Amino acid sequence: MHGAGNDYVVMDARNQTQDWPEVAKKISDRHFGVGSDGIILVAPSDVADVRMRMFNPDGSEAEMCGNGIRCFTKYVVERRIVVKEGALKVETGAGILEVTPIVTSGKVARARVSMGEPRFRAEDIPVAVPAGQKGFQLDPRQLDIRTVPTDTLVAGYPITVDGRTFKITCASMGNPHAVAFLDEPVDGVLLEIIGPKVEHLPLFPRRVNFHIVNIQGRDKLKARTWERGAGITLACGTGACAIQAVARLLGLTDDMVQLAMPGGVLTITWPGHGPVIMEGPVEEVFEGEWRG
């Protein structure tokens, strides 16, 4: 399945015990496996309708995946693993999220996800700003949302990779994100070289998802992503939410934006408070049996 080109192998793991990190490595391999941006597991939950687990191609387990949860929703709804009207409550590593499937001709074609509130405090992301340095390096008047204490923010913070400096602003959507707004087209940046170096900077104790963004209007953004544990992907749902949260925080966008990534367009809404709402497409590509 894929959501805006972010592709996953989804499996019902309610009655299975496997070495899932190793399974993820084998299945995700695009040359010797099925090929994907990771695997997603359906698991039972004591606190929600169902539980979602997600493993990256390197075997690491991620807290959440915005495009993945749409794939997950299509899987559990169409296979009647969860049978209910309206929104589903899904347990994830980032908390319990509410997902509303949007059905067309009897199939889940899109999904709307309440992704939770963005967090900007350095310790919540986490970002380990070196002693003696300030994480917040902007004029406070640049902030459109003043409820966030500037002494807890990492905003406009310069990082240098391969002799090039990016000014990043960081946020958590249950997983860590660093966002850099660029004047030059994002398509021309050698993200395959820069991305892994940013991911593994000592600044990020749990590594980071790195996004480069062009602002094309108050309601229109374009971005590319290097995902922690996965590399360059065609889209990143939590990343799209973090991008809009950061842009809205800095007064660069309106409440709702169309965010274009190489795999498609996501609609992201955040008015400066409450949960970020993400809506986007989901498609099943094929079904098969993995024999290891």
What are these regions (language model features)?
Residues I168, P176-V179:
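Selected transmembrane alpha-helices and immediately adjacent juxtamembrane segments
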Residues G116-P118, P126-A128, P176, P205, ...:
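Proline-rich low-complexity regions
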Residues M1-Q16, V113, V129-A131, Q137-A171:
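N-terminal, positively charged, Ser/Thr/Ala/Gly-biased leader segments
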Residues I125-V127, I159, V198, W290:
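Short clusters of hydrophobic/aromatic residues that line enzyme substrate/ligand-binding pockets
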Residues M1-V108, A178-G292:
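A glycine-rich beta-to-alpha transition motif near the start of alpha/beta enzyme domains, typified by
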Residues V83, A87-L143:
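Hydrophobic alpha-helical segments and helix pairs
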Residues A171-M173, M278:
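Active-site donor-nucleotide binding/catalytic segment of nucleotide-sugar enzymes
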